[in-house]
Amino acid sequence: MNLISRTLTRAVSSSLYHSKAAKLPTQKWIISQQIRVFSATVISGGGKKPLAKVSVKPPLNVATEKESTPPKKIEYKPEISNWINLIGFVEQPVQFGPCSDGKFWAGTVISQRSGSKSSNFWIPIIFEGDLAKIAVQHVKKEDRIHVSGKLFIDSPPPNVTYSQSNVQVMVQNLNFVQAATSTTKTISPPEKEVTSIKKKPARSKKVKVIDEETSNSWKHLIENPKEWLDHRGNKANGLVKPGHPDFKMKVGGLSLWLSTAPDWALLKLEELKFDVLVPKGNIKLNQLKGEESWKDLVQNPDKWLDNRSDKTNVKYPDFKHKETGEALWMTNSPIWVLSKLPPLKKNQERPFMSNKVSQLELDVEVPKGNLKQLKREEIWKNLVENPSKWWDNRLDKRNPKGPDFKHKETGEALWIGDSPTWALSKLPPLKKNQERPVMA
């Protein structure tokens, strides 16, 4: 604040400190009148005459007059001490900048203009916080404004030798004065920044405030789009949180949100191309990437292994890329791909390249130790196709652990609990009183 205060001091020094004669207009000062009673000595004709007595009227006896009502006493309130209201014209462009404490300050000078320029009285005013941002954006030279706030004293800069200290106003409320007969348009900062004597000040319409630092950042983004990452699409698709920055600088991590963008920057954004970084480890990210993988599976089936028919573990992937090892599961497949998947291929001990046919076919990878499972699939297929060659024990099992089906010639046993899903709907109807050996 001192920096801006000193600058304003230099700006108004011609009228406050060093005018042409290094004097302030006499009408600006109230000098108490001194009444002196003296005796005059008149010397004439070589002789002395007695001192002339000057008649002095006695002061009025105030007590003899009717006593007036004394001023009322009010409660002392620190927030209204040194409070002042001023209306004047802006004489200098608003100066703006940050201070060492992290806050933003702005300042200018106002004057109550009169017919004679020599009698203009300039008063420095200071804005703090959000009100400073509003002032630098909206207040222009020659504007007529109303300000209210507290008076404070700032010592003159070192290069000024005048002994008078500089009186300034720390503005708390700012209004534009449109006309003498019209109402004023009020601009107020957020409530947390305003110290007001009103308990509940009226809220004004929010003004989009853009400080110099933010404006410079948007300028850098427009001029160097390849140095920034665009997260607008990620936010729209829910890949990042709603409060995530819309743009983030690759080096340094500087963040920008569209809500702080100047109008001129918004108009140029659509013309630029940015790099897009899709977050890692996100479910929706995997879905987006999976769309491309499923498309590759349908278009290049010979590059994928089909494990659907011989999975020993439900967590094992249904498809696996031969070169990259990328895995796909049917539970995550898009709806459009279901109708384009190939029929199951089985009984392939080693992966081999399928012949090009009109129907989509995939190679099948048979994991080690899974040949027995493939063989059991064939046995269930034999049961479905040749039910007369099997004993059906489902209705008359004497031992719950006994097989549900048993081959009449080979003695091969099958249990419903181990049957493939596809076989359940194709099993033969229940049979009774079959002539067969007694089952254990």
Swiss-Prot record:
<keyword id="KW-0677">Repeat</keyword>
<keyword id="KW-0238">DNA-binding</keyword>
<comment type="function">
    <text>Binds single-stranded DNA.</text>
</comment>
<protein>
    <recommendedName>
        <fullName>Protein OSB3, chloroplastic/mitochondrial</fullName>
    </recommendedName>
</protein>
<dbReference type="GO" id="GO:0009507">
    <property type="term" value="C:chloroplast"/>
</dbReference>
<keyword id="KW-0934">Plastid</keyword>
<feature type="region of interest" description="PDF region 3">
    <location>
        <begin position="380"/>
        <end position="428"/>
    </location>
</feature>
<dbReference type="InterPro" id="IPR012340">
    <property type="entry name" value="NA-bd_OB-fold"/>
</dbReference>
<feature type="region of interest" description="PDF region 1">
    <location>
        <begin position="218"/>
        <end position="270"/>
    </location>
</feature>
<dbReference type="GO" id="GO:0005739">
    <property type="term" value="C:mitochondrion"/>
</dbReference>
<dbReference type="InterPro" id="IPR000424">
    <property type="entry name" value="Primosome_PriB/ssb"/>
</dbReference>
<keyword id="KW-0809">Transit peptide</keyword>
<dbReference type="InterPro" id="IPR011344">
    <property type="entry name" value="ssDNA-bd"/>
</dbReference>
<keyword id="KW-0496">Mitochondrion</keyword>
<feature type="domain" description="SSB">
    <location>
        <begin position="80"/>
        <end position="178"/>
    </location>
</feature>
<feature type="region of interest" description="PDF region 2">
    <location>
        <begin position="294"/>
        <end position="342"/>
    </location>
</feature>
<dbReference type="GO" id="GO:0003697">
    <property type="term" value="F:single-stranded DNA binding"/>
</dbReference>
<dbReference type="GO" id="GO:0006260">
    <property type="term" value="P:DNA replication"/>
</dbReference>
<feature type="transit peptide" description="Chloroplast and mitochondrion">
    <location>
        <begin position="1"/>
        <end position="61"/>
    </location>
</feature>
<keyword id="KW-0150">Chloroplast</keyword>
